């Protein structure tokens, strides 16, 4: 190990301990709460201390541990990370086994629903990539796509009424991005027969509601057309017995890693309009998988 690596490791360790002391100080003195492992995890998420989050999760804490305060019974670490817009914490929690479809009370408020509600496109993208069910409905029978559509029309109505607005607010831009991500995932899921045959839960009341919305809403239909164009492109890219579309839907990083040296595969994100981010996430995973195999 080089001197530079030793120094960097030492700096990381010192930084970790300083942050741990500050988190404990914040919990005990500023917040006047009990010092426990759950509070340490939630406070670390709040302050974006990914090193503490990883250290706590490595020690075996439940990544779905409830929020310490009973009045926030719907909150778990994943939902809290979404409310803090902490993408690194979301990824760490998922890697250590956080349930992307979890909900802790009768409202059936899932992490995906919270991401849509808070207007976090990146959070929505991450959750869907790692298996969040787009067809789960709340106790009021609302799907994430329906929620995003309602927010969109409320925002547009507000813009029409308030004539002082000259630029499109960020929240409206984010909402459009979220709707595009949700529609793209729904269309991608529906395009793969093997996936649908394995998971009959997708054929539910939520699925039927989403299907109707995507087929009737003017805005959602526009996104749907873009998705279908991308899907046709990916269907025609063959990797052995499978198309690139099958590999993307099923997140088959093992198979994709065997083709990762092919520049045409690496250039696929440039040929599509909607699925760029998801394809790049899959390619990154395949590259990491390939590098690990080379080392081993």
Swiss-Prot record:
Keywords carried by this UniProt record: ANK repeat, Repeat
InterPro entries: Ankyrin_rpt, Ankyrin_rpt-contain_sf
Annotated Pfam families: Ank_2 (PF12796)
First and last residues of every ANK repeat: 73-102, 107-136
Name listed for the protein in its UniProt record: Putative ankyrin repeat protein FPV216
Lineage: Viruses, Varidnaviria, Bamfordvirae, Nucleocytoviricota, Pokkesviricetes
């Amino acid at each position: 190990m080089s001197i530079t690596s030793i120094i960097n490791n030492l700096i990381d360790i010192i930084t970790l301990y300083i942050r741990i002391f500050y988190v404990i100080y914040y919990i005990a003195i500023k917040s006047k709460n009990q010092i426990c492992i759950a509070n340490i995890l939630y406070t670390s998420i709040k302050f974006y201390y990914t090193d503490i989050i990883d250290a706590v999760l490595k020690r075996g804490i439940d990544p779905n541990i409830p929020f310490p305060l009973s009045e926030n019974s719907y909150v778990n670490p994943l939902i809290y990370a979404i409310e803090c817009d902490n993408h690194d914490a979301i990824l760490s929690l998922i890697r250590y086994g956080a349930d992307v479809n979890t909900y802790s009370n009768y409202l059936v408020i899932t992490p995906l629903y919270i991401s849509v509600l808070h207007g976090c496109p990146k959070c929505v993208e991450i959750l869907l990539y790692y298996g969040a069910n787009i067809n789960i409905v709340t106790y009021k029978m609302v799907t994430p796509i329906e929620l995003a559509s309602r927010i969109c029309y409320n925002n547009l109505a507000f813009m029409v009424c308030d004539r002082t607005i000259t630029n499109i607010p960020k929240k409206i831009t984010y909402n459009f991005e979220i709707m595009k991500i949700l529609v793209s995932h729904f269309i991608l899921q529906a395009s793969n027969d093997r996936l649908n045959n394995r998971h009959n839960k997708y054929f539910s009341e939520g699925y039927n509601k989403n299907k109707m919305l995507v087929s009737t809403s003017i805005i959602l239909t526009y996104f749907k057309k873009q998705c279908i164009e991308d899907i046709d492109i990916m269907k025609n890219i063959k990797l052995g017995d499978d198309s690139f579309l099958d590999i993307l839907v099923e997140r088959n990083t093992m198979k994709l890693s065997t083709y990762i040296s092919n520049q045409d595969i690496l250039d696929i994100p440039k040929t599509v309009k909607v699925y760029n981010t998801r394809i790049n996430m899959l390619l990154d995973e395949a590259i990491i998988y390939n590098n690990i195999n080379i080392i081993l």
